[in-house]
């Protein structure tokens, strides 16, 4: 059925349907009205009946009138009901009609769709039915005046155009998704390049493209055809196939093109729809036969300048897998050019392994061409007058010429395809990867644009909010920072600015250097393209070079700058922010590990040093990376000394949280000084150096055997915060007198930054000697001498590290010597009060340190060299070292008899105060941890005033406590020999240091009476005494021993830091309570205190 008729019928159907629909709508409206009327009438009738019921009978006329009225009403109701029924039926019929019409319309629509099926689908169908079908394009040559009979064997070389063979062209005739046509004997895809009918510029493009093709191997020209284009070609070809119904060997007269010419139908062949199948199938079959025939023999027979004339109607494309194809456009005989009106459609075909000649040749005898022109040169000049390009595929000298004439179907082409051939710049494809060219506007233009943009925004804002204009046009006069600051701050602000400028200048210089280096490297290295591209793009290169080098300079310069930051320690030294001194036995530095690593790792371990065991905790005798180990047994003390200077200073973060700063063994004592350098420039995370000078693990840890336990688990945050805080103090106080800092740091740092655990004060015989020996063997010079040496040390960092290590070792030596000396002289000393000893020792240590601290103030200005941190570390260390005297024996089994009571008693005060300090610190640290972020903000560190005050108060309190304790101890010793009758007399709990809730400063209750106090403790303590001595232990001792036993049992469970800290505080409290409970008479204060403790702690004790 003709398409037009179908359209007409469909339109009629649609009109009918519309008509029915309007009718239905009208009827529905009527129906609704009728229904309303009916309801109204019914209700009216009902109402009247109801009203009339109670009315007394009137005259006969009235009765008659009423009856008539009611009848009328009833009739109307009935009428309405009939109407409604009728309307409903009509609507029903109309709807059924409408549905029939719409069904009919649907059928018509489907028929139309069938006729409108794209010819691509037909083509698909045909090619799939024919197993070996090739996609063909047969084209009309509408007005070619010359007639020639077609010869079965065309001459391949005819138009002199040759194509260098290209491998495996993509099939262009099929849409991208479809497979390339597979001819059985010729499995090569075809390529069509089409020219739009009237566009001369397209001719030119084709010609120039021919040149390009011959110049370089091209990708399949498929890219030059858009999918629409391809589909269009297929449709066209099918249309034309149909219009050339049979292709026979007899020539068709070209004078009568109408015989084959079918006018374009916009892709729909309405009239010939039915016959299309047969015609197309016939043509395809015929062409296949021709191809098979040609495939065998034509290649041999074809001459280069034979005079064969094609059948004008159809052209066969044969493709095969073949060597690369180049196309060249070729001038054609002028007689043809003149007579031709529609530019031809050009087909590319790959020659099959036995190249095939075309089944048809376009009219005319092509001029004979010498073989060499056709052969390898592959490029023939294009004559400007020629409107046709013919392509030949050459393989081993045999050519297949394909010239196709195409009738104009331009309405189907993709409109932009002619203007923008996608192949135009294909040759430069490899260059694209080489260059990245960005369009950058000149800065003036940008400024201009920005200005305009702002103006626009302003104008809009002013429109919306006129009040805003006043602000803009009369901005408030802002004061500069300089005006706002007072003199003190102004000065520091200026200094800060100067520093900033200096730094910026240095960075600029660096960048310039880098840029110069970059420019010296020829940019061509960076963007070397293949030589061919260089030849082509030599001009472009000149233009591109600037852009490219600029980009490369920037990114490369940045990279190099970053790299240099690592190596540039010396340069950056002066500008870094103050550094932290953190005591870090077991926690990571604040900065990320990575921030430390690049800087600290480069230090090579000294050759002689013992092997490093970086991951594990420093087990006895093993050296953890930063630790100076002094294996006195191994006898490598000298080594260690050198190592002290050059050894690897690895950051604590690297050596893992478990490492101990003192690994102690019978034979070894290793002190560790860890110098952690965090490069501020790179990672502004930490201060320039966070040095952890961890000399001597907290003595408590060693003594109490808590090493792994508490080192591992005590809240690291506490330490971190505190150490940072105190290091801040240190820095800010750097100008202050050493004594002040020392006083500050002495207890607070020691106690703060190290895990606080009780320590038995039993001297360890072997250890004292070992330590002192190994350290004294080191032969470290005094800090001041080292400072003197400093110029000799090439790298300031190494110098710092050396100082650090020496200090560590020196201090350890001092401790050990001190310990050894004090062992002998201690009884007497402690009679005078341990406080004295502690202070003496500290004084002694400070004596050794003072030269150093004297040295420091000049260095403080460059934070990198600031050596201050050694003080805090050493102070705590000494503090601890003095207290350190015991090995980690859970019970004091090795106590030598003799006046050890003195020694034991000494730690009592410090032991307890240490506990409360630990608690206090935990609480303050937890506060501090939250504040820390503020503390570290900006280039300056602020130390918390609260912290400082607290530490001073604690010191005073502790000093007082210790003095009291000393007196008590003396009294106790005197009383210990008194009559056994007093044994049961409980003394007041005055001697106990009350463990208060964390953060509260402990109170020491002075003993009301010396008599009751001391002896009362002896009975309970005596049973616990170890074999060495029958002397009574004081409360402190007992508690510590309890603690030790308890701890050794539960060491495994201690890893959780919160658990540990809780346990420490709870345990101590409970033990204090137990000890207190022994005493019969308790002061009101004691009772109250105990009650409070019980209330707070009982649950925890039960854990």
Swiss-Prot record:
Annotated crosslink Glycyl lysine isopeptide (Lys-Gly) (interchain with G-Cter in SUMO2) location: 405
Coiled-coil stretches noted in the UniProt entry, renumbered to this chain: 444-521, 941-979
Subcellular location: Apical cell membrane
Phosphoserine sites (modified residues): 322, 352, 383, 567, 624, 692, 696, 748, 862, 951, 979, 1009, 1016
One Pfam family matching this protein: Paralemmin
Any GO CC annotation of this UniProt entry: side of membrane
UniProt keywords, alphabetically: Cell membrane, Coiled coil, Glycoprotein, GPI-anchor, Isopeptide bond, Lipoprotein, Membrane, Phosphoprotein, Ubl conjugation
Region Disordered, annotated ranges: 178-197, 304-396, 483-544, 566-662, 745-794, 817-907, 962-1035
GO BP annotation list: actin filament organization; cell surface receptor protein serine/threonine kinase signaling pathway; protein localization; regulation of cell shape
Start and end residues of each stretch annotated as PKA-RII subunit binding domain: 797-810
Cross-link (Glycyl lysine isopeptide (Lys-Gly) (interchain with G-Cter in SUMO1)), chain numbering: 405
Modified positions (Phosphothreonine) in chain numbering: 757
Top-rank taxon: Eukaryota
Protein topology in the membrane: Lipid-anchor; GPI-like-anchor
Biased composition (Low complexity): 380-392, 506-521
Compositionally skewed regions (Polar residues) per UniProt: 179-189, 522-531, 566-579, 633-643, 745-763, 976-990
A molecular-function term among this protein's GO annotations: protein kinase A binding
Composition bias type Basic and acidic residues, residue spans: 490-505, 533-544, 817-829, 865-886
Family annotation (InterPro entries): Paralemmin
Function description: Binds to regulatory subunit (RII) of protein kinase A. May be involved in establishing polarity in signaling systems or in integrating PKA-RII isoforms with downstream effectors to capture, amplify and focus diffuse, trans-cellular signals carried by cAMP. Binds to and modulates the structure of the actin cytoskeleton.
Domain notes: The RII-alpha binding site, predicted to form an amphipathic helix, could participate in protein-protein interactions with a complementary surface on the R-subunit dimer.
Protein name: PALM2-AKAP2 fusion protein
Gene designation per UniProt: PALM2AKAP2
């Amino acid at each position: 059925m003709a398409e037009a008729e179908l359209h007409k019928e469909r339109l009629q159907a649609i009109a009918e349907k519309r008509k029915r629909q309007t009718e239905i709508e009208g009827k529905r409206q009527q129906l609704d009205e009728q229904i309303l009327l009916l309801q109204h009438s019914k209700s009216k009738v009902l109402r009247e009946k109801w009203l009339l019921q109670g009315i007394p009978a009137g005259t006969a006329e009235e009765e008659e009138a009423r009856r008539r009225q009611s009848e009328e009403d009833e009739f109307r109701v009935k009428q309405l009901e009939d109407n409604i029924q009728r309307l409903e039926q009509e609507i029903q019929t109309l709807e059924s009609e409408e549905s029939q019409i719409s069904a009919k319309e649907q059928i018509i629509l489907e028929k139309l769709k069938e006729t409108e099926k794209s010819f691509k689908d037909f083509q698909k169908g045909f090619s799939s039915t024919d197993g070996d079908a090739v996609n063909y394009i047969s084209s009309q040559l509408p007005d070619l005046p010359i007639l020639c009979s077609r010869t079965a064997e065309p001459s391949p070389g005819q138009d002199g155009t040759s194509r260098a063979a290209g491998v495996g062209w993509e099939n262009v005739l099929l849409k991208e998704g479809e497979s390339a046509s597979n001819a059985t004997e010729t499995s090569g895809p075809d390529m069509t390049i089409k020219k739009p009918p009237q566009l001369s510029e397209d001719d030119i493009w084709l010609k120039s493209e021919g040149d390009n093709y011959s110049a370089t191997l091209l990708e399949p020209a498929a890219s030059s055809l858009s999918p629409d284009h391809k589909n269009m070609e297929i449709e066209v070809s099918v249309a034309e196939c149909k219009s050339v119904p049979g292709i026979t060997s007899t020539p068709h007269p070209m004078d009568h093109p109408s015989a084959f010419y079918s006018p374009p139908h916009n892709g729909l062949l309405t009239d010939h729809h039915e016959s299309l199948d047969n015609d197309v199938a016939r043509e395809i079959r015929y062409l296949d036969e021709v191809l098979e025939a040609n495939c065998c023999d034509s290649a041999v027979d074809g001459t280069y300048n034979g005079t064969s004339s094609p059948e004008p109607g159809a052209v066969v494309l044969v493709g095969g897998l073949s060597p690369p194809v180049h196309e060249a456009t070729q001038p054609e005989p002028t007689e043809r050019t003149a007579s031709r009106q529609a530019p031809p459609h050009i087909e590319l075909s790959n020659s099959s392994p036995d190249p095939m000649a075309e089944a048809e040749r376009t009219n005319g005898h092509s001029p004979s061409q010498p073989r060499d022109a056709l052969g390898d040169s592959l490029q023939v000049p294009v004559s400007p007058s020629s409107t046709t390009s013919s392509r030949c595929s050459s393989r081993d000298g045999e050519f297949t010429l394909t010239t196709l004439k195409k009738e104009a179907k331009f309405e189907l082409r993709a409109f932009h395809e002619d203007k923008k051939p996608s192949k135009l710049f294909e040759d430069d494809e490899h260059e694209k990867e080489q260059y990245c060219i960005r369009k950058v506007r000149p800065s003036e233009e940008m400024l201009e644009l920005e200005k305009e943009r702002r103006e626009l925004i302003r104008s809009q804002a002013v429109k919306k909010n006129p009040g805003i204009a006043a602000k803009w046009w009369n901005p408030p006069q802002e004061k500069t920072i300089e005006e706002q600051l007072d003199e003190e701050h102004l000065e520091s602000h200026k200094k800060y600015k100067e520093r900033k400028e200096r730094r910026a200048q240095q960075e600029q210089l660096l960048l310039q250097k880098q840029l110069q280096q970059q420019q010296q490297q020829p940019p061509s290295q960076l963007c070397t393209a293949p030589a061919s591209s260089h030849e082509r793009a030599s001009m472009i290169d000149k233009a591109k070079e600037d852009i490219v080098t600029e980009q490369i300079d920037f990114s490369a310069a940045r990279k190099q700058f970053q790299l240099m930051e690592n190596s540039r320690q010396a340069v950056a030294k002066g500008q870094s922010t103050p550094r932290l001194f953190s005591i870090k036995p077991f926690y990571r530095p604040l900065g990320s590990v990575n921030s430390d690593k690049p800087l600290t790792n480069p230090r090579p371990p000294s050759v002689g040093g013992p092997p490093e065991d970086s991951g594990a905790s420093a087990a006895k005798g093993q050296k953890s990376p930063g630790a100076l180990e002094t294996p006195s047994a191994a006898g490598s003390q000298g080594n260690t000394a050198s190592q002290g200077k050059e050894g690897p200073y690895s950051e604590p973060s690297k050596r893992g949280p478990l490492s101990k700063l003192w690994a102690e063994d019978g034979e070894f004592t290793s002190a560790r000084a860890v110098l952690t350098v965090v490069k501020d420039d790179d990672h502004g995370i930490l201060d320039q150096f966070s040095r952890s000078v961890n000399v001597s693990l907290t003595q408590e840890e060693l003594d109490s055997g808590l090493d792994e336990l508490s080192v591992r688990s005590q809240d690291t945050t506490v330490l971190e915060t505190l150490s940072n805080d105190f290091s801040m103090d240190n820095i800010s106080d750097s100008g202050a007198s050493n004594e002040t800092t020392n006083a500050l740091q002495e207890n607070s740092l020691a106690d703060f930054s190290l895990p606080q655990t009780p320590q038995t004060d039993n001297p360890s015989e072997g250890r004292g000697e070992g330590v002192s020996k190994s350290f004294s063997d080191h032969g470290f010079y005094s800090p001041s001498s080292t400072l003197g040496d400093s110029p000799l040390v090439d790298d300031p960092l190494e110098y710092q590290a050396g100082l650090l290590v020496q200090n560590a070792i020196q201090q350890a030596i001092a401790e050990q010597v001190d310990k050894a000396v004090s062992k002998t002289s201690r009884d007497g000393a402690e009679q005078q009060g341990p406080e004295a000893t502690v202070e003496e020792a500290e004084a002694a240590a400070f004596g050794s340190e003072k030269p150093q601290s004297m040295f420091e103030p000049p260095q403080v200005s460059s934070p990198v060299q600031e050596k201050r941190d050694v003080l805090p570390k050493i102070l705590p260390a000494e503090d601890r070292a003095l207290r350190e005297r015991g090995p980690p024996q859970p019970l004091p089994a090795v106590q030598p008899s003799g006046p050890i009571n003195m020694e034991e008693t000494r730690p009592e005060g410090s032991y307890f105060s240490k506990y409360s300090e630990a608690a206090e610190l935990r609480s303050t640290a937890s506060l501090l941890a939250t504040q820390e972020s503020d503390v570290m903000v900006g280039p300056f560190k602020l130390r918390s005033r609260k912290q400082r005050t607290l530490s001073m108060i604690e010191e005073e309190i502790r000093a007082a406590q210790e003095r009291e304790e000393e007196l008590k101890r003396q009294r106790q010793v005197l009383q210990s020999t008194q009559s056994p009758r007093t044994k049961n007399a409980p003394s007041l709990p005055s001697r106990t240091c009350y463990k208060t809730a964390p953060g509260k400063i402990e109170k020491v209750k002075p003993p009301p009476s010396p008599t009751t106090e001391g002896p009362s403790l002896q009975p309970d303590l005596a049973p616990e005494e170890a074999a060495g001595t029958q002397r009574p232990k004081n409360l402190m001792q007992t508690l510590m021993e309890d603690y030790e036993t308890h701890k050794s049992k539960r060491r495994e469970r201690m890893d959780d830091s919160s658990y540990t800290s809780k346990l420490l505080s709870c345990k101590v409290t409970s033990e204090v309570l137990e000890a207190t409970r022994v005493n019969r008479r308790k002061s009101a204060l004691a009772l109250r205190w105990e009650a409070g403790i019980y209330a707070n702690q009982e649950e925890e004790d039960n854990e």
